[in-house]
Protein backbone atom coordinates (compact mmCIF):
# COMPACT_ATOMS: atom_id res chain seq x y z
CA UNK A 1 0.00 0.00 0.00
CA UNK A 2 1.40 3.38 -0.92
CA UNK A 3 1.65 6.39 1.33
CA UNK A 4 -0.93 8.22 -0.77
CA UNK A 5 -3.43 5.38 -0.35
CA UNK A 6 -2.78 5.28 3.39
CA UNK A 7 -3.21 9.04 3.73
CA UNK A 8 -6.47 8.95 1.75
CA UNK A 9 -8.19 6.53 4.14
CA UNK A 10 -8.90 9.12 6.88
CA UNK A 11 -10.91 11.07 4.29
CA UNK A 12 -13.46 8.25 4.49
CA UNK A 13 -13.51 8.68 8.28
CA UNK A 14 -14.36 12.36 7.78
CA UNK A 15 -17.07 11.56 5.21
CA UNK A 16 -18.57 8.87 7.45
CA UNK A 17 -19.47 11.34 10.19
CA UNK A 18 -21.88 13.57 8.26
CA UNK A 19 -23.10 10.69 6.09
CA UNK A 20 -24.13 8.49 9.01
CA UNK A 21 -25.35 11.53 10.95
CA UNK A 22 -27.64 12.29 8.02
CA UNK A 23 -28.79 8.65 7.88
CA UNK A 24 -29.45 8.62 11.63
CA UNK A 25 -31.52 11.81 11.36
CA UNK A 26 -33.29 10.92 8.13
CA UNK A 27 -34.00 7.23 8.81
CA UNK A 28 -33.22 6.37 12.44
CA UNK A 29 -30.16 5.59 14.56
CA UNK A 30 -31.14 1.92 14.37
CA UNK A 31 -31.21 1.91 10.56
CA UNK A 32 -27.93 3.85 10.37
CA UNK A 33 -26.34 1.33 12.77
CA UNK A 34 -27.58 -1.64 10.73
CA UNK A 35 -26.23 -0.08 7.50
CA UNK A 36 -22.90 0.69 9.20
CA UNK A 37 -22.53 -2.80 10.66
CA UNK A 38 -23.55 -4.38 7.35
CA UNK A 39 -20.71 -2.51 5.64
CA UNK A 40 -18.31 -3.73 8.35
CA UNK A 41 -19.57 -7.29 7.82
CA UNK A 42 -19.17 -7.04 4.03
CA UNK A 43 -15.68 -5.57 4.29
CA UNK A 44 -14.64 -8.25 6.82
CA UNK A 45 -15.86 -11.01 4.52
CA UNK A 46 -14.07 -9.35 1.60
CA UNK A 47 -10.83 -9.35 3.57
CA UNK A 48 -11.28 -13.03 4.48
CA UNK A 49 -11.93 -13.87 0.84
CA UNK A 50 -9.04 -11.80 -0.47
CA UNK A 51 -6.41 -12.95 1.96
CA UNK A 52 -3.16 -11.10 1.44
CA UNK A 53 -1.57 -9.33 -1.52
CA UNK A 54 -4.82 -8.01 -3.00
CA UNK A 55 -4.14 -4.28 -2.85
CA UNK A 56 -7.27 -2.99 -4.60
CA UNK A 57 -9.61 -5.01 -2.39
CA UNK A 58 -7.57 -4.13 0.69
CA UNK A 59 -7.83 -0.40 -0.04
CA UNK A 60 -11.56 -0.70 -0.78
CA UNK A 61 -12.22 -2.68 2.41
CA UNK A 62 -10.26 -0.29 4.58
CA UNK A 63 -11.99 2.69 3.00
CA UNK A 64 -15.24 1.03 4.13
CA UNK A 65 -13.87 0.40 7.61
CA UNK A 66 -12.75 4.02 7.96
CA UNK A 67 -16.12 5.25 6.67
CA UNK A 68 -17.84 3.17 9.36
CA UNK A 69 -15.41 4.28 12.06
CA UNK A 70 -16.32 7.89 11.39
CA UNK A 71 -19.97 6.91 11.14
CA UNK A 72 -20.05 5.62 14.70
CA UNK A 73 -19.01 9.04 15.94
CA UNK A 74 -22.37 10.27 14.58
CA UNK A 75 -24.51 7.20 15.29
CA UNK A 76 -23.50 6.71 18.94
CA UNK A 77 -24.70 10.11 20.21
CA UNK A 78 -27.92 9.89 18.18
CA UNK A 79 -28.63 6.36 19.41
CA UNK A 80 -27.86 7.36 23.01
CA UNK A 81 -30.27 10.29 22.84
CA UNK A 82 -32.93 8.13 21.18
CA UNK A 83 -32.68 5.32 23.69
CA UNK A 84 -32.11 7.20 26.95
CA UNK A 85 -33.57 10.62 26.15
CA UNK A 86 -31.86 13.98 26.57
CA UNK A 87 -32.48 14.09 30.33
CA UNK A 88 -30.03 11.20 30.80
CA UNK A 89 -27.85 11.78 27.72
CA UNK A 90 -24.59 12.98 29.30
CA UNK A 91 -24.26 10.19 31.84
CA UNK A 92 -25.12 7.47 29.33
CA UNK A 93 -23.07 8.81 26.44
CA UNK A 94 -19.97 8.68 28.64
CA UNK A 95 -20.56 4.97 29.10
CA UNK A 96 -21.25 4.43 25.39
CA UNK A 97 -18.08 6.27 24.39
CA UNK A 98 -16.06 4.35 26.99
CA UNK A 99 -17.26 1.12 25.34
CA UNK A 100 -16.18 2.52 21.94
CA UNK A 101 -12.65 3.07 23.30
CA UNK A 102 -12.59 -0.31 25.02
CA UNK A 103 -13.54 -1.92 21.70
CA UNK A 104 -10.61 -0.18 20.03
CA UNK A 105 -8.21 -1.55 22.65
CA UNK A 106 -9.62 -5.08 22.49
CA UNK A 107 -9.64 -4.99 18.69
CA UNK A 108 -5.93 -4.21 18.66
CA UNK A 109 -5.22 -7.04 21.09
CA UNK A 110 -7.32 -9.53 19.10
CA UNK A 111 -5.64 -8.48 15.83
CA UNK A 112 -2.21 -8.89 17.38
CA UNK A 113 -3.06 -12.36 18.65
CA UNK A 114 -4.42 -13.34 15.23
CA UNK A 115 -1.10 -12.32 13.67
CA UNK A 116 0.86 -14.23 16.34
CA UNK A 117 -1.27 -17.38 16.14
CA UNK A 118 -1.87 -17.60 12.39
CA UNK A 119 1.02 -15.60 10.94
CA UNK A 120 -1.41 -13.21 9.26
CA UNK A 121 -3.87 -10.49 10.17
CA UNK A 122 -6.44 -12.07 7.83
CA UNK A 123 -8.05 -14.11 10.59
CA UNK A 124 -8.66 -11.00 12.69
CA UNK A 125 -11.60 -10.42 10.36
CA UNK A 126 -13.40 -13.54 11.64
CA UNK A 127 -14.25 -12.01 15.04
CA UNK A 128 -14.89 -8.69 13.30
CA UNK A 129 -17.49 -10.33 11.05
CA UNK A 130 -19.06 -12.23 13.95
CA UNK A 131 -19.25 -9.09 16.10
CA UNK A 132 -20.80 -7.18 13.18
CA UNK A 133 -23.51 -9.85 12.95
CA UNK A 134 -24.08 -9.65 16.71
CA UNK A 135 -24.23 -5.86 16.46
CA UNK A 136 -26.81 -6.03 13.67
CA UNK A 137 -28.98 -8.34 15.78
CA UNK A 138 -28.63 -6.11 18.85
CA UNK A 139 -29.44 -2.99 16.83
CA UNK A 140 -32.55 -4.57 15.32
CA UNK A 141 -33.85 -5.93 18.62
CA UNK A 142 -32.77 -3.33 21.18
CA UNK A 143 -31.86 -0.03 19.51
CA UNK A 144 -35.19 1.64 19.97
CA UNK A 145 -36.56 4.12 22.43
CA UNK A 146 -37.98 2.39 25.51
CA UNK A 147 -41.68 1.98 24.85
CA UNK A 148 -41.01 0.96 21.24
CA UNK A 149 -40.98 4.32 19.44
CA UNK A 150 -38.07 5.81 17.53
CA UNK A 151 -37.35 9.46 18.32
CA UNK A 152 -39.22 11.73 15.96
CA UNK A 153 -41.46 8.94 14.71
Question: Where would I find each of the regions flagged by the language model?
Answer:
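Symmetry-related core transmembrane helices of the 12-TM Major Facilitator Superfamily/SLC fold
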Residues: 123-141
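Paired intracellular helix-loop junctions of major facilitator superfamily
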Residues: 81-90, 119
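C-terminal ends and interior cores of transmembrane alpha-helices
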Residues: 39-52
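Interfacial helix-cap and linker-helix signal at transmembrane-aqueous boundaries
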Residues: 23-24, 110-119
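Short, small-residue-biased leader/transition segments that mark boundaries at the very start
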Residues: 2-9
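Hydrophobic core of transmembrane alpha-helices in multi-pass small-molecule transporters
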Residues: 57-71
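Intracellular juxtamembrane helix-capping segments at the cytosolic ends
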Residues: 71-84
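Cytoplasmic membrane-interface "Motif A"-like loop-to-helix N-cap segments
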Residues: 26-37
Amino acid sequence: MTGVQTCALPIFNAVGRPLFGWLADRLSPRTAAVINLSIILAMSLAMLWAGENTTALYVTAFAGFWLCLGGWLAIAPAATATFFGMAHYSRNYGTVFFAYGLGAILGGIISGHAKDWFGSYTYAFVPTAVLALVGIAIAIVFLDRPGGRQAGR
